[in-house]
Amino acid sequence: MRYDKLTAKFQQALAEAQSLALAADSSYLEAGFVLKALLDDQNSGAAALLAHAGVNVPQVKQRLQQHLNSLPKVSGQGGDILPSRELQAVLNLMDKAATKRGDAYIASELFLLALVQQNDAAGKILKEAGATEQNINAAIDAVRGGQNVNDANAEDQRDALKKYTLDLTQRARDGKLDPVIGRDDEIRRAIQVLQRRTKNNPVLIGEPGVGKTAIVEGLAQRIVNGEVPESLRNKRLLVLDLAALIAGAKYRGEFEERLKGVLNDLAKDDGNTLIFIDEIHTLVGAGKTDGAMDAGNMLKPALARGELHCIGATTLDEYRQYIEKDAALERRFQKVLVGEPSVEDTIAILRGLQERYEIHHGIDITDPAIVAAAELSDRYITDRFLPDKAIDLIDEAASRVKMEKETKPEAMDKIDRRLIQLRMEKAHVEKEKDDASKKRLELIDEEINGLQKEYADLDEIWKAEKAISDGAANIKKQIDEVKIKIEQAKRQGDLALASKLMYEDLEHLEKQRAAAERADTDSTKPANKLLRNNVGAEEIAEVVSRMTGIPVSKMMEGERDKLLKMEEVLHRRVVGQDEAVRAVSDAIRRSRSGLADPNKPYGSFLFLGPTGVGKTELCKALAGFLFDSEDHLIRIDMSEYMEKHAVARLIGAPPGYVGYEEGGYLTEQVRRKPYSVILLDEVEKAHPDVFNILLQVLDDGRLTDGQGRTVDFKNTVIVMTSNIGSQHIQQMGIQDYEAVKEVVMEDVKEHFRPEMINRIDEVVVFHGLDQANIRSIAKIQLKGLEKRLEKQNLRLAVSDAALDIIAKAGFDPIYGARPLKRAIQSEIENPLAKALLAGNYAPESEIRVEADGDRLKFA
């Protein structure tokens, strides 16, 4: 016989059999080695074919191994091993069988048929296990499905559905899919399209995370439960694994062969199989090399004829980018748009998933946590979609509580660390012999004993709580498993088993769960509990705060006091601007108490006043107050935006322009730090068109960047500073605040458009500074110098008379507080730098600055 007529799979089996024979020191290549090679290869299909024929495969494997072990061994065997006479006879019978069946190639299943016809040892083993010529022939016909072997790789194309798909209906039967709540309209529309005669292929289109794949899982569950029209009952829903199709397709045409195998299997199934292709846009161009067809083009004829019942899922952007471009592919699909669910629908979805997450994490998820997850994710996580982002919050909060539960509680950890510290101290003190050391040793022993007792008590409580909690979690898991078995029994029509499970097993487990919950409640008072065993709204708020940097959690007493005393804190840095400080403080208090409009920024202000009076300093103080750091101050110098086209730098260049990928300075900063103070400095110097983009920010708290993404400004404070009208403020001095503001507003109305002024929460006019204000600012600035000197182990003391001289030197009604900085530099810092370099001051010494007439002297 010609070996080139053997299929690739059988050639591989012969090579493997030769290796087995060499390893066994056999003198010939026996048929038994080939049978073992075929049975050991998972992809050969030999074991499956024998099982299909009703043969006891484990018995065959066991007897075959015994037979091979009993074969005579020849030591020193080298080179190729020749086939035995029996094997040659089997191969000749295979050739005859292939010719009889009209095959161009000899497939490995014919080896099993020929072996049964022979009377050698391997053939006898098969016959004893139940193999006959008739049942092997019938099994071959069933596996081939009426097709001939006309290709060396024909065996690889068999069972293509098993290799390249995942059975979603089977997963639904096994209870491995999450429950799908709602989405009835979309599922009904998909079923409607699937029932069409031709082009019965729905494609689910929606934003990422809205639940497209969940709709298909919902359809699988409905098919399993028989809640679909007659034409869809008992159908299988398979997920195509495109990655498995492409993986390992080394040679040209191999990918097409695999896909053709899948399509042939589907055609043979006579419409009883639905295929789901997630991320269907990946079909366009998949497997395309020079001159080859891509998967999309190969599927078109089957889709058009209605042979392929396909459900696709993709996002709006990818549908537009890939599928709409190919009009012939697009017309074969029917669009089913999947929108984002509302907050109410998301709450219902989360309630449906609650039990699955409780079982996975082994903790309880409260209803307030579910409501908080839906509402907070909708408000604060703006770049993603419901229900995905709400599910993420629940999952992460539960994961955090589980992690705390499985690690040592904080109270025990503190005692543990203290014990380590005391034992180290004890080891050192024991070496000393004086009375003080002995006394200290007694105290250490006493403290160690006390802490060990406390630790043992806490450990006992912790273990008891953990045991109760783990027990309750285990019972929940068992309840879930019983519910799945009840559903399976109902589907199979075994009502006796279903009622036994429901009224005996389930009731018993429910009683156990109730008892475990009571034990958990009674075991310790809430105040003494070491373990957190449930997820509440506060835990969800903590996760949102960590993800976004926005303080969402309930205000602690400390923060309430801080907000009530906000003016006092800001006045430590900003001197003499009572109206401005009050306006900013009121805006922050409104937002943190939840009274502010949630669709607008926390506050938007226009600060007007002469240079150096504290406009920018107030913004820095505000950022420091809110975030304990000035890093959250986004400062934009508007003098850099004098040209009309400079607006692109704020929101990002439009498509087609250089820098499109980089994004805008303002939008990118706010996306990274959504809770910020935005300072638009010297706003009057910018081009008037730049203000047009600020209109929607001030009104709706949102801005669309160059890439079409919506950036959320609802958690920002927007401050614009300007010198407009500063000449009036200087002329009128500290008169009636409202009169000064009225005059300044006339200038503002000339420069800014009415729609801009109308959207600003408050226009705040800053006063010019008087001598007393400058003296207070001098104190603040000298404190900064004191801190810098402290790092060098030096102290600074400035007398009141010296402070008066500095304030007088730094006072200029036109330039505000900025000349003061220069005065401190020239009068104190310059001479002090020389003295330090000369080594006039030793470490730990005090530098006293005193008045000497109109000059300063250092002592």
From Swiss-Prot:
Coiled coil region boundaries: 391-525
GO biological processes: cellular response to heat; protein refolding
Main location: cytoplasm
Subcellular localization(s) per the UniProt record: Cytoplasm
Region of interest (NBD1), ranges: 159-340
This protein's record includes keyword Signal: no
Residues annotated to bind ATP 1: G206, E207, P208, G209, V210, G211, K212, T213
GO cellular component: cytoplasm
Record region (Repeat 1): 6-71
Segments for region (C-terminal): 769-859
Gene3D superfamilies: 1.10.8.60, Clp, N-terminal domain, P-loop containing nucleotide triphosphate hydrolases
Keywords: ATP-binding, Chaperone, Coiled coil, Cytoplasm, Nucleotide-binding, Repeat, Stress response
Single GO molecular function: ATP binding
Record: residues binding ATP 2: G609, P610, T611, G612, V613, G614, K615, T616
Alphabetized SMART domains for the sequence: AAA, ClpB_D2-small
Every Clp R domain range: 3-146
Annotated region (Linker), positions in chain: 341-549
SUPFAM superfamilies, per database record: Double Clp-N motif, P-loop containing nucleoside triphosphate hydrolases
Chain intervals for the UniProt region annotation (NBD2): 559-768
Family note: Belongs to the ClpA/ClpB family.
NCBIfam families named in the record: chaperone_ClpB
UniProt remark on domains: The Clp repeat (R) domain probably functions as a substrate-discriminating domain, recruiting aggregated proteins to the ClpB hexamer and/or stabilizing bound proteins. The NBD2 domain is responsible for oligomerization, whereas the NBD1 domain stabilizes the hexamer probably in an ATP-dependent manner. The movement of the coiled-coil domain is essential for ClpB ability to rescue proteins from an aggregated state, probably by pulling apart large aggregated proteins, which are bound between the coiled-coils motifs of adjacent ClpB subunits in the functional hexamer.
Subunit details: Homohexamer. The oligomerization is ATP-dependent.
Function, in words: Part of a stress-induced multi-chaperone system, it is involved in the recovery of the cell from heat-induced damage, in cooperation with DnaK, DnaJ and GrpE. Acts before DnaK, in the processing of protein aggregates. Protein binding stimulates the ATPase activity; ATP hydrolysis unfolds the denatured protein aggregates, which probably helps expose new hydrophobic binding sites on the surface of ClpB-bound aggregates, contributing to the solubilization and refolding of denatured protein aggregates by DnaK.
Descriptive protein name: Chaperone protein ClpB
Organism field: Neisseria meningitidis serogroup A / serotype 4A (strain DSM 15465 / Z2491)
Name of the coding gene: clpB
